């Protein structure tokens, strides 16, 4: 479960997010819609720990993303619209890099990567450089690192 409580983000005098409250229940699919400049990206960046809040809290399965970022981030995966891929890495190298960042134990890393690559159907391209993949395959690689 993700709980957003009284979330506020200010950039100087500009109020980007104004006392936002909502709950995301596990096992459901939600849409996050609004016009340009409504604060959607800012909210998502706060929820995933990429940006700090001015006020409020974001709890991910009870862990505050601002106070316990490592514990909270273990609970979620996030795929931005344009995933930050390293184009000069092979798919496998990138997956190993992502697994290391997520602190997946070395003993479980290879099996975990294999499972995810099969799940998102990128196993057959794991030796290719990311820069040589189609946009669709790059999106799959981004999804794989989020899982």
What are the residue ranges of the model-derived segments?
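ABC transporter nucleotide-binding domains
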Residues: 2-4, 9-147
């Amino acid at each position: 479960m993700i709980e957003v409580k009284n979330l506020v983000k200010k950039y100087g005098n500009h109020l980007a997010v104004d006392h936002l409250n909502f709950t995301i229940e596990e096992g459901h699919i939600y849409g996050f819609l609004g016009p340009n400049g409504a604060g959607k990206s800012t909210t998502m960046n706060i929820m995933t720990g990429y940006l700090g809040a001015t006020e409020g809290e974001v709890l991910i399965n009870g862990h505050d993303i601002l106070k316990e970022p490592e514990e909270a981030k273990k609970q979620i995966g996030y795929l931005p619209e344009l995933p930050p891929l390293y184009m000069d890495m092979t798919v496998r190298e990138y997956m190993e890099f992502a697994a290391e960042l997520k602190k997946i134990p070395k003993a479980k890393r290879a099996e975990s990567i294999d499972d995810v690559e099969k799940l998102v159907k990128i196993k057959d391209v794991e030796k290719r450089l990311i820069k040589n993949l189609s946009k669709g395959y790059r999106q799959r690689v981004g999804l794989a690192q989020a899982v």
